[in-house]
Amino acid sequence: MRRWFKKTLPRPPDEEESAGLTNKDIVETNHLYPTITNLSLNSDTSSILFDKNKKPLKPKIIIPDKEFDLDYYLKDETESIQSPFEGFTAQPNFSNFNKQGNTMNREANFQRTNEKIQRNKSIKRVKLFHGNLILDCPIPKKLLVTLPQQTEREFAYMRYSAATCDPQDFSKSLFTLRQPLFFQPRKTEICIAITMYNEDEVLFARTMHSVMKNISHLCTRKNSQVWGKDAWKKVVVCIISDGRTKIHPRTLAYLAAIGVYQDGIAKNQVNDKEVKAHIYEYTTQLSIDPNLKFKGSDRGIVPVQMIFCLKEKNQKKLNSHLWFFQAFCPILKPEVCILLDAGTRPGDQSIYHLWKSFDLNPQVAGACGEIVVMKGKLGSGLINPLVATQNFEYKMSNILDKPVESVFGFISVLPGAFSAYRFEALQNDSQGNGPLASYFKGELQNTGKSGIFEANMYLAEDRILCFELVSKKNEAWILHYVKSAYADTDVPDRIPEFVLQRRRWLNGSFFAAAYAICHYYRFFRTSHTISRKFMLSIEFIYQLATIVFGWFNIGNFFIIFYILTSSLASTSANFLPGEILFRIAIWIYASLLVTCFVLALGNRPHGSPNFYLSMVIMYSILMGYLLFCSGWIAYRAISDAIHNASSTSSSYTSALLNSNVFINIVISLSSTYGMYLVVSIISFDPWHMFTSFVQYIFLSIMYTNVLNVYAFCNTHDVSWGTKGDHFTNNDLGVARLLQKGADVEIAIPTNQSDIDAKYEDAVKLLASPSLEFNSPIINHGEQEDFYKNFRTYVVLTWILSNLFLVGIVLSIPKINGISISNNETSAYLSFLLWSVVAFSVFRFIGCIFYLFIRLCTGE
């Protein structure tokens, strides 16, 4: 039988009480909003409770509940202790029960518990605060009794705010956060944003637990002027989930298990205004590692201030950053903002090293660390050639590309998965122009107001932010690479996911780079020194050359393939099957290229995985033959040079140096790959050369002929792979304004037993084995004709320009072949190979300078 009752609850008269921070004593009560006490935060003491006469109160210790003891979950994996949940532990044990059956039972129990608590919800009359619904909710007692600190209000209560405004109007709508409302407002040094969509609890735990270990490290730096014992009070972690219906249920259970989230509190509407985001604030003292083991203070975990923003609708990652930068950061006013993606695992001291780069150099506006590919236990992931290829690619980018850009002061992209920004540098000017204004301009494409060029450009919006920071008018900001900061991340291990990921990266980076080059003149409006402007000019010439070579990459690769394979067809190569293999290889190459275009224009990678896998395998075989041709030509050139030296009684060295084929092919290729090895050894990170180099060489043709083709053929697709929501749910209920006054009626769970039951069920759900969570199938609507026409223009221009280049080069006999007997090599082939050497030398020198600067600064 339903038990409904109405009771007017007193609401706090000022802003401090709305945050749960007032000068009232703690009173035993069953209300959702009990009278509360002030938190006095001194620099040398922890939070202390005071009575009305400013006298310290004696801490109140709650007696643990014997039926539910979360301390069991705080044990290490090696300790054998029976779980309080009928044999279930926080780590799934597949040997004791059926995976699917028990998980489904847990989910069914979870649903039944929800229904029961829905029936037991009480109708409460609540006074809106400045027209906003703000609730101060007690955490489950079953959680509270396990915490080492129980009396401070930030540990005993979770604060819920129903945001009915857009993020940029958060402060204007009189919403606020806990940090500025303490008796002594807390200063935020670092604010960490973790964005997620539908990542499961393991991926989220990988990031969250690593962040907590980083904060624990900050608390151990006792000799620091900024950090120390209470360093956790200077760090705020913001978790922003993109869509309430998209979040993984087990991730929500994770957040509930550490006290950040409570079910049954949120509402869809407040006073007939649609809720845009549900904001939960809590200072947790627990962490759950990727093995789903609880960790507490005995494992070094310190309290962490957390803000969980659960967006009502799925509005993409850029909108999540809008909430972070425009809603939360203006209130918290952090010195440094760190961006993380759920699933990325920062090193235990990486956040400190990122922050330190800002502390050492006040001109640093943004910084990033090394993105490391997760290779599995004992490097087992490298068995997959696709993972090994990406491992080599990431490593060489972190060894060559990022350091040279850091030396010049402009890094083309700070990866959104792991990067940091100085909040001061992000601010717009008085006219509303600046980095953040440009960064969030991409939000206009959701309303259909942006052009296709801008839409593609904002697929790599982090590149736009980097350019806007360094080119900010009357400022002299620079970007910096921090090698000592690193973060592990998963990479696609299947071709379809890899193709889709690189489509967005390639299109976004191409159009963003074009935008930066076209607006290069803005650097002369900055306050950079003349020497810095000169260095930036050199870097942009390098970037321009990179774009040009990238545009003609598909044509140049075919030219190289044609010249080298046709050279074995000549009699001077002394390779009998050379003519037949040449014709077969060219026909296969052309057929695969046509297939790539057909699939890219009409098929989804997930819909044709076997086609794409077959193409990658065939291209790898062709690459193997190309390597054989290069080796055979080098062998014949060296043999011919030795023979000439013997016949003319000259030295072998002079004979080799007089061989054009040896110099233009052997020396150029050896120089390029030799520099890769040397710079890796100098950087004390050479292992990828031995574990991933061969895989990268064989699959490098895929980057040119598969990824580039798919990317250019899909410039009309400006999606991130997710589709925004355009409907309103009413499943949470509404807070309706009563006729008189500012009171609303809401249905909420108030019985402690119901709150504890919800918490216990969330922990049980987290403890049960995980079933595969299938995301909804995304059904993109038809794109506008304008977008498709733009795609047509881009693809035609790209194909025709490359065909023109191929036709010109291959039609001139003197530059389209190699003759070993006549000591002649293709002039265009020599130009391409030595251009690659020049790019490598440029990056090599930049890397040496970076390592020298790093050594001098002690970074």
Curated annotation (Swiss-Prot):
It catalyses: [(1->4)-N-acetyl-beta-D-glucosaminyl](n) + UDP-N-acetyl-alpha-D-glucosamine = [(1->4)-N-acetyl-beta-D-glucosaminyl](n+1) + UDP + H(+). It is a multi-pass membrane protein. GO terms for molecular function: chitin synthase activity. Keywords: Cell membrane, Cell wall biogenesis/degradation, Glycosyltransferase, Membrane, Transferase, Transmembrane, Transmembrane helix. It is found in: Cell membrane. GO terms for biological process: ascospore wall assembly; chitin biosynthetic process. This is Chitin synthase 1. The lineage of its organism: Eukaryota, Fungi, Dikarya, Ascomycota, Taphrinomycotina. The gene is chs1.
